[in-house]
Amino acid sequence: MNLSDLSHPNQLRDLSVSQLGRLAQQIRDKHLQTVAATGGHLGPGLGVVELTLALYKTLDLDRDRVVWDVGHQAYPHKMLTGRYANFHTLRQKDGLAGYLKRAESPFDCWGAGHASTSISAALGMALARDFQGLNRKVVAIIGDGALTGGMALEALNHAGHLSKTNLMVILNDNEMSISENVGGLSLYLNRLRTDPALRQIRSNLETQLRNIPLVGPTFSPEFERFKDTVKYMTMTRSKAGVIFEELGFTYLGPIDGHNLGDLIETFEFAHSLPGPVFLHAITVKGKGYEVAEQNQIKYHAQSAFDLATGKAKPASKPTPPAYTSVFAQTLVKLAEQNEKIVGITAAMPTGTGLDKFKERFADRYFDVGIAEQHAVTMAAGLAADGMRPVAAIYSTFLQRAFDQIIHDVAIQDLPVFFCLDRAGVVGEDGPTHHGVFDLAYLRQIPGLVVMAPKDEAELQRMMVTGIQYTKGPIAVRYPRGSGSGAPLMAEGWDPVPIGKAEVLRSGDDLLIVAIGTMVHPSLQAAALLSEHGIDATVVNARFAKPLDTELLLPLARRIGRVVTVEEGCRMGGFGSAVLEALMDGGIAVPTLRIGIDDKFVTHAGRSQLLDLLGLTPSGIAKTIRESLSTEPVSAPRA
C-alpha cells in the first residue's frame, strides 16, 4: 500500500511490519519535501514516524483517543488521517494548520500549541469514558521537553492516583543518548514484572503474610522492603522508571522508538494492562535526515530550506536585523556594564535570542525548561535580593504565568524586566502562538509599566529603560521578524522617559495614536489620508501604561477626533486605555479603535494576516475613511 492510497488510519491494522516500514519512508519523504517548501517543524515529526504507525496499528481510531502534546510531532498523524493529499498546504493561508485542530479533522481530538497539556486532557477523556461506560483506549504522547512543564507533572501525579482509570502515557524521549538495555531484554523484563499471574501471586502472598497472627503486622514492613527491592532490580534499565512507578504507573521501557516490531508488541501488551501505564520510547529527533540528526536544535523548526544542503533559502533582498537579534545584542552590551543582569528563558534560548547572552555570560543565564510560572517567580526572587532579572518569554507563553506576575512580582513591586518576543501576530503558527493579548492582560496590573517600540532603534532605548527602572515590574513587547531598518547604535543609548509619548506628524483633522509596530503604518496611512484632504496628527504612544495623558488629552480636546491603532486585541487593549483616559478626562470626542476583533486569528504569513486584519497603511486609511464618511471632516470640535 502507498501512503496516497490510505484513506483511513484503521487500514494500518491489516498491514505487515514490512509494509509499515515502506509507509514510514514515504511519510519521511513527504514530510521533508513539504517542510522544505513551506517551513515548519522538522525534527520532531521525523522522529515519531515508526511510533505513530505502530501505535495506530494497535488502535481503532474511530473509537480510541490519541492526544498529541503541543503538535510539533503530529505531521505523520496528519498524513495518516486523511490529509496526505492536502499536506502541501501546511501552514499556508487557507491550508492545513501547523498544529492539531479539532475543527480540521475528527481524528484531532485535542488541539494545542502550548506544551504540557496532553496528559491532563487525556486523563479528562479517560474519566469521561469511564463515566459513560464506554470501551475506548486513551493515549497521551508527550516529549521529554514538554514533560518538564509543571502541568504535565501535576497530571502524572493525579493520573497515578486513579489506579482504576486506564490511561497510556507515551514519553517520546528524543534525547541523543539511548540506554544500553533497549531491546529484547527490556521487553522480557516488562513482561516478567507485569505478568498478571505474578501480580496475583504477589497480592496473595502479601495478604497471607498480613493475616498471620501476631507475626503478620511485623512482617508487612519487611514485605514492603522486599517489594521495593524487586521493583528496583527489575528497573535497572531506567532510573526514571522508578519515579513513574512510585507515582502509580506501570512503567514499560525504554524501548527503541524506531523498531516497528518491538513497538507493536509493546503497545499491544500495554493495552492489556489495567490502570495507568507509562511507556518510555527512545527516538532520534530528525530521524532519516542526516542534516537534522546532526543539528537537532537548529532543525527542530525551519523556514523554507534547500533539501539537498539543509540551508535556508536566501531572502530575495537583504533584510534589516530581527527584533530578537537587536534585543539580544543590546542585552549583552548592557550586561557587560552591569553584573547584576541575569537572563531567564523558559526552554526558548534560540527563539528569544538568549543563546547569545549564554555564550557571553553562562553563569548569569538560566533556562528553566517549559516552566513559565517558575521562571517568573524565580525572577521575582532574584529581584528581591538585588539582581536585575530579564525574563525573555514569548508573549503567548507569558499568559501561563499571569498569577505569578500579579502575586509574586507586582504586589511586591519587584523590578522584574519582562521582554515579550513574538508580540502581535506571528504568522504560520496560528492562534495558539499569536501574541495579541498581552497589552490587555498586562495593563490591568497595578504598578506594571508596559512599553512597545515603534522600531528596533527604539527597542534599544527601551532596553535601557527597562534595566534602569527599579520602582516595580516593567515589560516591553516586540514582534517576530525584521525591523524597519532604523539606524542602530552600538552603545550609548538614552533611555525613553517613562510614560512619555512623541508627536511624529501634525495635522488638525484627526489624532491618530498608535503603539509599537503600528506607528510606521499609521504614519503611512496619514500620508494616504492627506491625499483625500484629511490632515492627521500621529503620536507614537510608546507606553500602553502609563499613558502620556499630558500630551494626549489636550490634543484630543483640540482636534476632536481620535483613532487608536494597535497590533493586539481591541477588547481591553491599548485603544480601550486611551478611551478610558478620554472619558476620565471629560473629553467626549468620536473615537475609533483599530485593532484585532474579538476572535482568534488564523494561520498565514505575517504580512498576509496584517492585510487580512486591516493593519496595513492602506487598511488603516480605508477604515478611517469609512468611519469618517458618515461624519463631515468639518464637524464641530468637542
From Swiss-Prot:
It catalyses: D-glyceraldehyde 3-phosphate + pyruvate + H(+) = 1-deoxy-D-xylulose 5-phosphate + CO2. GO terms for biological process: 1-deoxy-D-xylulose 5-phosphate biosynthetic process; isopentenyl diphosphate biosynthetic process, methylerythritol 4-phosphate pathway; terpenoid biosynthetic process; thiamine biosynthetic process. It comes from the Bacteria. One of its GO terms (cellular component) is cytosol. Thiamine diphosphate binds at H72, G113, H114, A115, G145, A146, N174, Y289, E372. Its EC number is 2.2.1.7. The keyword ATP-binding does not apply. SUPFAM superfamilies: Thiamin diphosphate-binding fold (THDP-binding) (SSF52518), TK C-terminal domain-like (SSF52922). Homodimer. Belongs to the transketolase family. DXPS subfamily. NCBIfam families: dxs, PRK05444.2-2. This is 1-deoxy-D-xylulose-5-phosphate synthase. The gene is dxs.
